[in-house]
């Protein structure tokens, strides 16, 4: 069985962009938990949070994670998926977790360039740069503790994918005596 790959990291780190390209490169299926959830409940994340609160959204997010997990799949997760211990445990036990790490300034620049940035409800009520810094400070340790692989996601997607592939191959050689792909 080819294990699923779970991409974790903050908003703007490239989980969806890198995930789609990685899935193509590895000939795997791609799914984004936020997109899957929104399509299945016919509501945006903002609508879910407004109606059910963050706790309701997080519960739906956990269910989405389990629903989309399948062999030979690259899963782009929501930035806060690691907040729930059950999600961290689930990902570690059911696949390989890859943390796409990037500094605050890179994340803010990417988010400001996205037209849908205003569609996501604020977590702190602060400016984008303050919120990104605060949220990353709180979550970075959880991303790092959960990840099997940590990749510098400040580079172009092609470089990030090359690094992921090399690290997956190293991991496979250490664990199995063979290549991942």
Curated annotation (Swiss-Prot):
UniProt-listed Enzyme Commission number(s): 2.7.1.71
Compartments, as annotated in UniProt: Cytoplasm
Region (LID domain): 112-126
Pfam families: SKI
Residues where ATP binds: 12-17, 120
Key words, A-Z: Amino-acid biosynthesis, Aromatic amino acid biosynthesis, ATP-binding, Cytoplasm, Kinase, Magnesium, Metal-binding, Nucleotide-binding, Transferase
Residues that, per the record, bind substrate: 34, 58, 79, 139
Details of cofactor binding: Binds 1 Mg(2+) ion per subunit.
A Gene Ontology term for the protein's cellular component: cytosol
Annotated pathway: Metabolic intermediate biosynthesis; chorismate biosynthesis; chorismate from D-erythrose 4-phosphate and phosphoenolpyruvate: step 5/7
Keyword 4Fe-4S: no
Purpose of the protein: Catalyzes the specific phosphorylation of the 3-hydroxyl group of shikimic acid using ATP as a cosubstrate.
Domain notes: The LID domain closes over the active site upon ATP binding.
Name of the molecule in the record: Shikimate kinase 2
């Amino acid at each position: 069985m080819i294990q699923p790959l779970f991409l974790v990291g903050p908003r703007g780190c490239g989980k969806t962009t890198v995930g789609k390209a990685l899935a193509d490169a590895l000939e795997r299926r791609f799914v984004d938990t936020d997109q899957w959830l929104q399509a299945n409940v016919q509501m945006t994340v903002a609508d879910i949070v407004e109606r059910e609160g963050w706790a309701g959204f997080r519960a739906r997010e956990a269910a989405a994670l389990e629903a989309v997990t399948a062999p030979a799949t690259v899963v782009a997760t929501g930035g806060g998926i690691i907040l729930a211990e059950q999600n961290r445990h689930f990902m570690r036990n059911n696949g390989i977790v890859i943390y796409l790490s990037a500094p605050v300034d890179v994340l803010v620049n990417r988010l400001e360039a996205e037209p849908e940035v205003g569609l996501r409800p604020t977590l702190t009520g602060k400016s984008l740069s303050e919120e990104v810094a605060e949220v990353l400070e709180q979550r970075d340790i959880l991303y790092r503790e959960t990840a099997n692989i940590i990749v510098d996601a400040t580079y172009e997607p092609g470089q990030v994918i090359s690094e992921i592939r090399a690290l997956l191959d190293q991991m496979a050689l250490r664990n199995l005596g063979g290549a991942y792909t």
